[in-house]
């Protein structure tokens, strides 16, 4: 039995049940007693939701991150821990890798630690096969699940994400209006976020009536050596491009190195735009124009939503944050 069963049998919202459990005064005595009677009848014992009652709460949040060496994910974990600490919560961090079975294992581990909620950082936690996401939905029946940069429909899963589609659409459109017609797109993932970015690229070309060339959409591992090797093979194939947009800053850094080594000028011959606005953008020459997905804002919003959920408030299940293009030296905007 869980909080949803109590809600259904008592004929009240999940938020109302949560308020009763948390001792929130904004519930009538009649409703409160009805909820308590149902809880007793079905044998439901509050655990992590019972913050106000002090029942089994650990004041601890689980954080799941697929790869702590990824600059975006590492930065997100930092801001999450900072904001949780400000709100009086500790955190357990699990670096899960990308395999489904390890993600399932670590989620089960966090639930066994009786954490108050779980934050999943990055859309790599969403699988293409929807059945493989069932373990996340099952966990959401026990604790609130916060998902950063991905979307999964469930009443107890709360998603905070950037508008990746619009961000890439705007960046590509800006290049096109500057006269760039052969825009190479490099990406390293087919995650929810990765597919949103790719769809933004395609939509921008369509909106400006440019042909969609499959050769100009290349998947590439997120490291310098593989980026260089891929670009070198494209040159040998005779592929021409006058701009490059990448799904990650590191792919753009590899592109900068390759273009410079080939004797072409940036941005005169080739304009380059990265994604994430990471520290890497100012550690290269020329400095990289990049899309800022506001990771700190994402994390602050996520924790703010989480605190409201734990306090029994009604909150939206999806919050979208807009991105900004930070112009530096790899474009001539």
From Swiss-Prot:
Q: Where in the cell is it found?
A: Cytoplasm
Residue ranges forming the DNA-binding region read 3-22
Transmembrane regions: none
GO molecular-function term, one example from the UniProt record = DNA-binding transcription factor activity
Q: Which UniProt keywords apply?
A: Cytoplasm, DNA-binding, Transcription, Transcription regulation
Q: Name one Pfam family in it.
A: LacI
Protein's UniProt keywords contain Ion transport: no
SUPFAM superfamilies under this entry?
Answer: lambda repressor-like DNA-binding domains, Periplasmic binding protein-like I
Q: Provide the induction entry.
A: Up-regulated on galacturonic acid.
Q: GO CC terms for this protein?
A: cytoplasm
Note the Gene3D superfamilies from the entry: 3.40.50.2300, lambda repressor-like DNA-binding domains
- Give the HTH lacI-type domain ranges: 1-55
Protein purpose: Involved in control of pectin and galacturonic acid metabolism. Probably represses a comprehensive set of pectin fermentation genes by binding a conserved palindrome at or downstream of their transcription start site to block transcription. In the presence of galacturonic acid may activate transcription of acetate synthesis and other aspects of carbon metabolism.
Q: Could you tell me which PANTHER family the record lists for this protein?
A: HTH-TYPE TRANSCRIPTIONAL REGULATOR GALS, LACI-RELATED TRANSCRIPTIONAL REPRESSOR
| Protein name (record) | HTH-type transcriptional regulator Cphy_2742
Protein species of origin = Lachnoclostridium phytofermentans (strain ATCC 700394 / DSM 18823 / ISDg) (Clostridium phytofermentans)
């Amino acid at each position: 039995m869980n909080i949803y069963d109590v809600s259904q049998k008592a004929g009240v919202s999940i938020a109302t049940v949560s308020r009763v459990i948390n001792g929130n005064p904004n519930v009538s005595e009649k409703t409160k007693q009805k909820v308590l009677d149902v809880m007793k009848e079905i044998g439901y014992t509050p655990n992590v939701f019972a913050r106000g009652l002090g029942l089994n709460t650990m004041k601890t949040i689980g954080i799941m991150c697929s790869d702590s060496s990824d600059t975006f994910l590492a930065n997100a974990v930092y801001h999450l821990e900072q904001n949780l600490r400000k709100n009086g919560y500790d955190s357990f961090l699990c670096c899960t890798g990308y395999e489904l079975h390890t993600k399932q294992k670590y989620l089960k581990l966090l639930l066994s630690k009786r954490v108050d909620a779980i934050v999943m950082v990055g859309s790599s936690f969403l699988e293409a096969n929807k059945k493989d996401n069932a373990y996340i939905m099952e966990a959401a029946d026990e604790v609130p699940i916060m998902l950063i940069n991905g979307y999964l429909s469930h009443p107890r899963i709360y998603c905070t994400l950037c508008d990746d589609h619009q961000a890439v659409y705007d960046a590509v459109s800006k290049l096109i209006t500057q006269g760039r017609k052969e825009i190479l797109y490099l990406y390293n993932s087919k995650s929810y976020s990765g597919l949103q970015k790719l769809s933004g690229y395609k939509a921008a070309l369509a909106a400006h009536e440019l042909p969609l060339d499959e050769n100009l959409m290349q998947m590439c591992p997120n490291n310098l050596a593989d980026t260089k090797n891929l670009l070198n093979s494209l040159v040998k194939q005779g592929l021409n491009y006058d701009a490059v947009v990448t799904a990650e800053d590191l792919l753009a850094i590899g592109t900068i190195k390759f273009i410079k080594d080939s004797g072409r000028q940036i941005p005169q011959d080739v304009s380059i735009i990265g994604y994430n606005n990471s520290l890497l953008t100012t550690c290269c020459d020329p400095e990289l124009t990049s899309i800022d997905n506001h990771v700190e804002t994402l994390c602050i919003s996520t924790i703010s939503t989480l605190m409201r959920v734990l306090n029994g408030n009604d909150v939206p299940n999806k919050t979208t944050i807009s991105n900004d293009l930070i112009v530096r030296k790899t474009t001539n905007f």
